[in-house]
């Protein structure tokens, strides 16, 4: 069996689903970080700023208020953009006072944990497939 067919056979598909309020938290977090990167010249790696910005731009065009079936919608970001979002959550939780957070600390922490879990699953599946 060719390696390509073997990979195809072993590939398991996983999807991340976020409720609309989680999409809103994600949008707010990314908007906050992108705004600070440009306004304040925050010293974060260029690749993180870039993927956070591209994720933010995608979310600007994603209708966060539409009623999805059962209130669930698939998240429209790439893995790189989700990594940028995870980094954004961590950055904001560590460096911002509560009164400057775009959402509550609990909401941002819950989103960070969900992103971390999702990206860990992707890593595990990628490792299994090689």
Predicted segments with their positions:
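Positively charged, low-complexity terminal tracts
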Residues: 1-130
């Amino acid at each position: 069996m060719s390696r390509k067919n073997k990979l195809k056979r072993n590939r398991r598909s996983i999807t991340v689903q976020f409720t609309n309020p989680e999409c809103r938290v994600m949008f707010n977090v990314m908007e906050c970080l992108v705004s600070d990167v440009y306004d304040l010249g925050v010293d974060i790696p260029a690749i993180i700023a870039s993927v956070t910005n591209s994720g933010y731009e995608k979310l600007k065009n994603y209708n966060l208020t539409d009623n999805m079936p059962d209130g669930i919608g698939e998240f429209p970001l790439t893995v790189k953009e989700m990594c940028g979002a995870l980094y954004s959550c961590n950055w904001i939780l560590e460096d911002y006072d509560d009164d400057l957070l775009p959402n509550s600390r609990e909401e941002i922490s819950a989103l960070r944990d969900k992103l971390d879990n999702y990206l860990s699953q992707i890593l595990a599946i990628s490792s299994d497939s090689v």
